UniProtKB/Swiss-Prot annotation:
Residue ranges, annotated region (Necessary for interaction with BUB3): 229-256
Gene symbol of the encoding locus: BUB1
Catalytic residue list: 917 (proton acceptor)
Protein name: Mitotic checkpoint serine/threonine-protein kinase BUB1
Annotated segments matching region Disordered: 305-333, 538-570
Sites bearing Phosphoserine, chain numbering: 307, 314, 331, 375, 525, 563, 593, 596, 655, 661, 668, 672
GO CC terms, sorted: cytosol; intracellular membrane-bounded organelle; kinetochore; membrane; nucleoplasm; nucleus; outer kinetochore
Length: 1085
């Protein structure tokens, strides 16, 4: 009879001459022959399996072959250290795509009590998409079920086997019945992989336990039985570890101690592995970014050199940035005069002559402040004060007055500590005074002289550069009203501008809003541009450890009255990210609705109450960005974070325009000097948290833009020209009026009446369950996809946006990144608008708008899966220029982006859709902006996002108009504030406000002069002045809903200027912006 050794020699000789494609098949037949003919010769089988592994270890063809994996697992049954053996297989790539390997590995770890490690092994198999996948997922679910059942300590103790006893039993019975014993061992080990133990092994194991017992001594009670079968006596346990002095530990206590030590070690090992993987990924990505930045630097250097050689000197002078140059003092005085009404110019003189007669209403106002802050219900009943007719101004914030002319000099040397609530932002707190939008340049070298605020940009001295970074940002933080007994008297104005700047630099006192009250403001430095928390439009976050420097667009101080010093407002860490979004559709931070006065409660602590009763002649309308509607004497606020509402008495009307009576109507003279506050309230205005995450209201005061008058005849005749070239043509006369197009009931009715419901879309999935828990650094099942959530991009009150990945996390090339917009309650409207927009647009235009891949609707929320944009919003790009010498975006880029915006809105309107929420942080930059090389489309990569406020005009009768105010957006159009009907005008205004942000780095405020709306900061030193005057005149002065300007004609005029001046420069400007974006992205890692 042939022996196995002889057959093996024959096999080896055969394999040397074998030329087939499957050598493993020959080995398989030989091993089967050995198992059938020599079942008891286990030692030879182990040697044969070891020889087989060495033969095929380096052959990648068989690494995931089921036959080879099965032999590896069979060899593992005879291995003493299974965990090390499985790691050896995995590190050599054997079985990485095979489910049996992971199941066997996890089964061994589970038997050892290493449940967390076992779970990690199964998860790794699922991530690697091991086959068969269904079987692996089933075993993972069974493992989780067993895990929940073994949480009780008693169950954990009874379910864990005594491995030493099993080994001893096997050794005792090995000679008496070796065949059956080995079969039992094989079955037991197989049961660890499958979770099922055969009854035969149970029976034999029970019989063996009756033979061997555990004793405190090192010898078994039935030692004679062991001696008969010539088996060495094995010590069951170490007495030194259990018996210590007079006390004795139990096995459970010893096992628990070892388990805790092993668990801590495994946790440390896992953390170290995770850290190394993350470090390698970051290093790889940083290397790619560095290579790309080096290439861009080289291209930028080459383009700049060529552009400097071809640039005429005259052209350079015409394009000097307005923030960096300024006329002489004499020219400033000459330019200042036409900007102010006659009453304003006479006010300082009159106040100097009789300073104690100027503020006759100060005591009543001071009392009204205290009453309003302590008891809002009482303050609302106080009658309005006498209007300050002599102090009406056109300034964007307030006029400065004083009781004593000498107090200016006195305040220059005195610093009054702020006693109000401190706002903790970052590592330090700056305390400055809230100022007007006069560009007051602090220059402390001028000494103690009185001054008048300057209305134009001063010369770029060293002090000016310091002041620009200082003053520019003090309006960039929210106002928290505090109870105050401050009744300091007003400060007077003088004619010397420089002394006022010096006084402003050193003193923390400032007069109140509209020249009535004083406000103490503290400048916060720990959060960035337009930041109101992690908001859902996932702009690119700024680095957390940003060096101290010039403030950026959106930083604001906290304005309040002096109050008791113990009150403190906690700092919100979410404000360290500039991924902002305005206008979440379900935003509760809304102004009061006339239809539901019962929704409002009494005033709360965070309610921002007016510092004084504003006279009707002084303020026409005050609007806080996105959150606030101001009334004539009282203001209303909804705190969306706590859903606490603060409103005036229920008897009054809530709309600021509807509230006015005919007696309160402004005369034409006073109206021409009043201001429409379109994006920020006065210092006494209402403040709320814009993004539902804190008490921040992102509002700005224009401190850098010089105020100048337009030539009276500069834009004569433009009205007729633009109205004749309307892009939408003449709209039919409205035959249908809708109050609020964003009403939840109306939207539900519109969605219910669709001929093709949203639920019928192929990429819409409805789940009859609640929204799963979605957290960073976790994975969850979304339909048939296993999604891994990386981190939170932005967060609002009702929506969070996460960056997620589908696919292998370790495979950087094949993994697909996207965003998850999670909303509670569900919001199918935004998905409907996005889908309709893609259907109505031409395929070549779809890349300019955000695309949703799918929508998952749950019972209590929704998840929208959309395209990921990696380089932040246009708002972030605007802020990046704050740390550059020019401080604002270059003109070439502004015109390029403006042309792209006009084209986007034209396409949206052609689809009969109103976006409804145009603003800088709803334009986002993707990879296309870095990769595109088209000469004619250098603003490619810019996309429009956030369709939650959009309106589908096809669902309404033709010519429908709306009357509601866009209460969830700070960019309210002129028609809303003047109580006129509107439809497409809201997008026109949004584009104008966004372009203004790019030009000046501040929010736009509009004034009405003689019935014509103009941006408050105009543009005396701005290049292409005529073009921008015409642009803002067309976008802000739309007669009605029937005659809309032509966006295409306006875009062609911008294109003409662009081609004349910036064709040779735009690529260098774009490359520089790319470098800034890449550096910003790398710095936040």
């Amino acid at each position: 009879m042939d022996t196995p050794e002889n057959v093996l020699q024959m096999l080896e000789a055969h394999m040397q001459s074998y030329k087939g494609n499957d050598p493993l098949g020959e080995w398989e037949r030989y091993i089967q022959w050995v198992e059938e003919n020599f079942p008891e010769n286990k030692e030879y089988l182990i040697t044969l399996l070891e020889h087989l592994m060495k033969e095929f270890l380096d052959k990648k063809k068989y690494h995931n072959d089921p036959r080879f994996i099965s032999y590896c697992l069979k060899f593992a049954e005879y291995n003493s250290d299974l965990h090390q053996f499985f790691e050896f297989l995995y590190n050599h790539g054997i079985g990485t795509l095979s489910s049996p390997l992971y199941i066997a590995w996890a089964g061994h770890l589970e038997a050892q009590g290493e449940l967390q490690h076992a779970s990690a092994v199964l998860q790794r198999g699922i991530q690697n998409q091991a086959e068969p996948r269904e079987f692996l997922q089933q075993q993972y679910r069974l493992f989780q079920t067993r895990l929940t059942e073994t949480h009780l300590p008693a169950q954990a103790r009874t379910s864990e086997p005594l491995h030493n006893v099993q080994v001893l039993n096997q050794m005792i019975t090995s000679k008496s019945n070796p065949g059956n014993n080995m079969a039992c061992i094989s079955k037991n080990q197989g049961s660890e992989l499958s979770g099922v133990i055969s009854s035969a092994c149970d029976k034999e194991s029970n019989m063996e336990r009756r033979v061997i017992t555990i004793s405190k001594s090192e010898y078994s009670v039935h030692s004679s039985l062991a001696s008969k079968v010539d088996v060495e006596q094995v010590v069951m346990y170490c007495k030194e570890k259990l018996i210590r002095g007079e006390s004795e530990f139990s096995f459970e206590e010893l096992r628990a101690q070892k388990y805790n030590q092993r668990r801590k070690h495994e946790q440390w090992v896992n953390e170290d592995r995770h850290y190394m993987k993350r470090k390698e990924a970051n290093a790889f990505e940083e290397q790619l970014l560095k290579q790309k930045m080096d290439e861009l630097h080289k291209k930028l250097h080459q383009v700049v050199e060529t552009s400097h050689e071809d640039l005429p000197a005259s052209q350079e002078r015409s394009e000097v940035n307005p923030a960096r140059m300024g006329p002489s003092v004499g020219s400033q005085q000459e330019l200042r005069a036409p900007c102010l009404p006659v009453t304003y110019q006479q006010t300082p003189v009159n106040m100097e002559k009789n300073p104690r007669e100027a503020p006759p209403v100060v005591p009543p106002l001071a009392n009204a402040i205290s009453a309003a802050l302590v008891s809002p219900a009482t303050s609302q009943s106080i009658a309005p004060p006498v209007p300050l007719k002599a102090q009406t101004v056109t300034d964007s914030m307030f006029a400065v007055a004083s009781k004593d002319a000498g107090c200016v000099n006195k305040s220059t040397h005195e610093f009054k500590p702020q006693s109000g609530a401190e706002i903790k932002e970052g590592c330090e707190t700056h305390k400055v005074a809230n100022t007007s939008s006069f560009h007051t340049t602090p220059n402390t070298s001028l000494g103690m002289v009185q001054a008048t605020p300057s209305k134009v940009q001063p010369s770029p001295t060293v002090h000016t550069k310091e002041a620009l970074g200082f003053i520019m940002n003090m309006f960039q933080a929210p106002t928290l009203p505090d109870i105050s007994d401050d009744k300091d008297e007003w400060q007077s104005l003088d004619q010397n501008e420089d002394a006022f700047e010096a006084q402003f630099q050193k003193n923390v006192r400032s007069s109140g809003a509209w020249g009535v009250n004083k406000i103490i403001s503290s400048l916060s430095s720990a959060f960035h541009v337009f930041e109101d928390g992690n908001k859902e439009n996932y702009g690119l976050p700024q680095p957390k450890n940003k060096p101290t420097g010039a403030r950026t667009f959106g930083e604001r101080s906290v304005s309040r009255l002096p109050s008791k010093p113990k009150e403190e407002v906690p700092h919100a860490e979410e404000f360290l990210d500039d991924s902002t979004v305005w206008g979440i559709r379900c935003n509760k931070t809304l102004a009061p609705s006339p239809k539901s006065p019962g929704d409002f409660t009494s005033a709360a602590q965070l309610a921002s109450t007016p510092f004084h009763k504003l006279p009707v002649e002084s303020v026409h309308i005050l609007e806080d960005k996105e959150n606030v509607v101001a009334k004539q004497c009282t203001q209303a606020t909804l705190d969306s974070c706590e859903e606490n509402m603060v409103v005036p008495s229920r008897d009054g009307k809530f709309s600021p325009i509807q509230e006015k009576s005919p007696k309160q109507a402004l005369s034409s003279h006073m109206y021409s000097a009043s201001l429409l506050r379109l994006s920020q309230p006065a210092a006494g205005g209402v403040l709320t948290c814009e993004a539902e995450l804190g008490v921040e209201a992102c509002r700005l005061t224009d401190t850098d833009a010089a105020i100048a008058e337009d030539p009276p005849d500069a834009i004569a005749g433009l009205q007729a020209e633009w109205m004749q070239m309307s892009s939408l043509g003449t709209v039919d006369a409205p035959n249908f009026i809708v109050g609020n197009p964003w009403d939840d009931k109306l939207i539900f009715k519109l969605l219910s009446g669709l001929s093709k419901p949203v639920s019928s879309y192929p990429n819409t999935f409805e789940w009859q369950c609640k929204l799963p828990a979605i957290k960073p650094k976790t994975e969850f099942q979304l339909g048939s996809k296993l999604v891994y959530v990386h981190h939170l991009l932005g967060e609002g009150a009702f929506a969070q946006v996460y960056e997620a990945t589908q696919g292998d996390l370790n495979d950087a090339k094949n993994k697909q990144k996207f965003v998850l917009k999670v909303q509670k309650p569900a919001n199918p409207w935004e998905f409907y608008i996005g889908t309709q927009l893609m259907e109505r647009l031409k395929p070549s235009m779809q890349h300019m708008f955000m695309k949703f891949y799918s929508a998952h609707l749950f019972q209590n929320g929704s998840v929208l899966v959309g395209e990921l944009y990696s380089y932040g919003t246009l708002l972030n790009a605007i802020n990046l220029y704050k740390n550059t010498p020019e401080k604002v975006m270059p003109q070439g880029l502004v015109i390029s982006f403006a042309m792209r915006m006009l084209y986007m809105i034209e396409q949206v309107h052609d689809c009969e859709i109103i976006h409804g929420d145009i603003k800088p942080d709803n334009f986002i930059l993707g990879n296309g902006f870095l990769e595109q090389d088209d000469e004619d489309d250098l603003s490619a990569g810019l996309a429009l996002i956030d369709l939650g406020q959009s309106i589908d005009m096809k669902l309404f009768p033709k010519g429908t108009i709306f009357t509601a105010k866009c209460e969830t957006s700070g960019f309210q159009c002129v028609e809303m504030l003047s109580n006129k009907p509107w439809n497409y005008q809201i997008d026109y205004f949004g584009v104008a406000a966004t372009v203004y942000c790019m030009l000046f780095g501040t929010y736009m405020k509009v004034k009405n002069e003689g019935g014509e709306c103009k941006p408050e900061g105009l543009f005396r030193r701005l290049p292409h002045l005529d073009m921008w005057n015409e642009f803002f005149h067309v976008m802000l002065n739309i007669p009605d809903c029937h005659h809309l300007p032509s966006l295409d004609l306006l875009r062609q005029k911008l294109k003409k200027v662009f081609q004349q001046h910036y064709t040779n420069k735009i690529r260098a400007l774009r490359n520089r912006l790319i470098v800034l974006l890449l550096e910003c992205k790398r710095s936040r890692k």
